[in-house]
Amino acid sequence: MAQFVYTMHRVGKVVPPKRHILKNISLSFFPGAKIGVLGLNGAGKSTLLRIMAGLDKDIEGEARPQPGIKIGYLPQEPQLNPEHTVRESIEEAVSEVVNALKRLDEVYALYADPDADFDKLAAEQGRLEEIIQAHDGHNLNVQLERAADALRLPDWDAKVEKLSGGERRRVALCRLLLEKPDMLLLDEPTNHLDAESVAWLERFLHDFEGTVVAITHDRYFLDNVAGWILELDRGEGIPWEGNYSSWLEQKDQRLAQEASAEAARRKSIEKELEWVRQGAKGRQSKGKARLARFEELNSVEYQKRNETNELFIPPGPRLGDKVIEVSNLRKSYGDRVLIDDLSFSVPKGAIVGIIGPNGAGKSTLFRMMSGQEQPDSGTITLGETVKLASVDQFRDAMDNSKTVWEEVSGGLDIMKIGNTEMPSRAYVGRFNFKGVDQGKRVGELSGGERGRLHLAKLLQVGGNVLLLDEPTNDLDIETLRALENALLEFPGCATVISHDRWFLDRIATHILDYQDEGKVEFFEGNFTEYEEYKKRTLGAEALEPKRIKYKRIAK
């Protein structure tokens, strides 16, 4: 095999208005290397993968794979044939084997014809069996079922045109992995995957013999899979040998050598690095420490000391002892039971991470908590002092023609944030929109910038209990870190739907896990502690992802 599978020489990319999004990148990729791509939103990460996939040829320099190298590319919005079923879409990846199996059946049938050319049939049979044997084709159904379970695909006979965006991405990812290319280019492969499916994907890619280049903000994924980090910083591609934790160490040392302009960013990195260095036992005590610090977080003096946060969550009124109590809750849609007899109590100071497969009913629980929907039976009781602030996952309901400042402020110079007033430009700046960035049109923002804007709009009510539905989607690692730090220092409670395990390990004091047939489990501890508990009580198989089973309403 060649020393490198892919080479880039002085690659640059200019986007309007004459901005060098990538410049002078020269890289060579080793066979079998696992590379995680990091960079702020808008740094050119997706552009880099499109160039490597051969889809963007309007570039400076040269980017090419070695002859004979098969490249597989997963874009953020993959294209599938809308007329196909899920099964037909997946079988496209193994069409050679599917066709060989089909033809082999026909060959067997032809042996029954006494006038057949048996020598010719035997030769064809041998060729077909060679193809099938090379791909373990006789176990094809088992392979497909295993992959479909691991990525929680919809039913085999579901039409692609009826699938959600997340379901289509999972089908496209499954198809790509089954193709077994020499080099995988993955743009946010963990998006729309629950935590168990991400863990399965980690193991798959760790054992994958080819080269992997993945854009992802899932830091456990980067820790467990990546042997290199490629950082895109102001157009340059900087390779770092090691995984994410190693990159944090190296990055901290590099920032220490740079000027004080990076001081705030370095402080945020050091907070996360301190958590990384603590080890499992230290991390597990973090959630308990948060509960103990609740009164300090509530103090006015602490809030004043904390005004330099990169991302600001406005504090609400002081929270009393009673927060949220759920008793014997049941909720169904059609003939599917989403929640069956759920009871739990959210203690003061808690941050509850909500996990489970897509479509299990996590967002439905939020809508019931906020009164938008009613349960079939049971109760949700909010404490008298509770003021909710909800952030949904739908970021499209923004006016693309407005500037960032206009979208948040409504044109007002002074905004009411909770029970206080503050200059609108100062408030918008607390969400990392500084100076000229406040004049950007909403339609020009990256996915991560839209996420920050969405938070700024919906958090201004100043709640003391936050309902955050997938707040980490599309955020770059810098913003994720800032959100984690802001939540840890927020003087209230939060319930957060997320599949980001690193995020959940850093912030969660409790886990609410949606399982099969309407069962939901409430656990005190963070995500890793919960996984250890499941493995200890139910065995290792409990951590393997499976397609969700819905309990049916008895007729």
Please provide the spans of the model-predicted regions:
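ABC ATP-binding cassette signature C-motif
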Residues: M1-A263, E307, I313-K555
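Intracellular alpha-helical coupling/juxtamembrane segments of multi-pass membrane proteins
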Residues: Q250-R293, L297-K304
